[in-house]
Curated annotation (Swiss-Prot):
The gene is gshB. ATP binds at residues 151-208. The keyword Hydrolase does not apply. NCBIfam families: glut_syn, PRK05246.1. Gene3D superfamilies: 3.40.50.20, ATP-grasp fold, A domain, ATP-grasp fold, B domain. Binds 1 Mg(2+) or Mn(2+) ion per subunit. Belongs to the prokaryotic GSH synthase family. It catalyses: gamma-L-glutamyl-L-cysteine + glycine + ATP = glutathione + ADP + phosphate + H(+). This is Glutathione synthetase.
């Protein structure tokens, strides 16, 4: 099948060759003979009602010294592409939202966008998880200090975090008797002006925060456990955690079964579930990672699984 695949991502020259999941996807697409086109947010624009971009034909290589090569930039409508991977990392700011509007125009013109632009806007990675209370720890979302304090007192040991953070930034643990709850709440809620999340602390974090990758609603059979550094409560690799690939547990598969149908319904083809012990904590939809670590440990080809799912959807559209 001849496919023209575009990708919107952060600068490719700055990625980590060893760890970057977008590169794994591009290599898998190129292995199928698909034609690749590279874009950054700044390259997207709209003219006369058409979403367009200054895009560069791209070749990628499994070579840590040289992993990409551009051809001459072209100016084309996004509807010249069959599929676009939206792989721009957070922050989830207004520029991110404007990008989804432009991609939504391409989608209306017949392009498959992964993940679906509307769902990228709708599915906040922390709030989305609360739609599955059977899977999550005790969870509260509020900006009122009295409501948050009451929850903290009931739980005794809680994690407090912003709704828009990534990489473990601004995550606090509060235990009964700690004197600093007021300043934590003031800081995170910006003196009561921003909603935050509080969750019951999960001691199982010591054994790792598991990243489970979902491809079109089905779990990859292995996960990456991100184990906190000594003295830390955050498993995020960006916060100093280390990764350890593992097979999924029965509970992991059960959680995936609870969430999979909703992901398919919302056009979320590639998603990362964060699970601590037996509890779902977040659903990452913007630019999930950990493909390379799992592939290297178990010989999987997760990028290939995603391309299979994309090809299936493109064939279904063509009838």
């Amino acid at each position: 099948m001849s496919v023209r695949l575009g990708i919107v991502m952060d600068p490719i020259e700055r990625i980590s060759y060893k760890k970057d999941s977008s590169l794994a996807m591009l290599l898998a697409a190129q292995d199928r003979g698909w034609t690749l086109f590279y874009m950054e947010q700044k390259d997207l624009y709209q003219n006369a009602g058409q979403a367009r971009a200054r895009m560069k034909p791209l070749k990628v290589f499994a070579d840590p010294a040289k992993w990409f090569e551009f051809e001459a930039e072209i100016d084309a409508g996004l509807d010249d592409l069959d599929v676009i991977l939206m792989r721009k990392d957070p922050p989830f700011d207004m520029e991110f939202i404007y990008t989804t509007y432009l991609l939504e125009q391409a989608e209306s013109a017949g392009v498959l966008v992964v993940n679906k632009p509307q769902s990228l806007r709708d599915c906040n990675e922390k709030l989305f998880a609360t739609l599955f209370p059977q899977c999550t720890p005790p969870t509260l979302v509020s900006r009122r200090a009295d409501i948050l304090r009451e929850f903290a007192e009931q739980q005794g040991d809680v994690i407090l975090k912003p709704l828009d953070g990534m990489g473990g930034a601004s995550i606090f643990r509060h235990r009964a008797g700690d004197p600093n709850l007021s300043v934590i709440l003031e800081t995170l809620t910006a003196h009561g002006t921003q909603q935050i999340m509080a969750q019951g602390y999960l001691p199982a974090i010591k054994d790792g925060d598991k990243r489970i990758l979902m491809v079109d609603g089905e779990p990859v059979p292995y996960c990456l456990a991100r184990i906190p550094a000594a003295g830390e409560t955050r498993g995020n690799l960006a916060a100093g955690g280390r990764g350890e690939a593992r097979p999924l547990s029965d509970k992991d598969r059960w959680i995936a079964e609870q969430i999979g149908p909703t992901l398919r319904e919302k056009g979320l083809l590639f998603v990362g579930l964060d699970v601590i012990g037996e509890h779902l904590t977040e659903i990452n939809v913007t630019s999930p990672t950990c493909i390379r670590e799992i592939d290297n440990a178990f010989g999987t080809n997760i990028g290939g699984l995603l391309m299979d799912a994309i090809e299936k959807k493109l064939q279904a559209r063509k009838g």
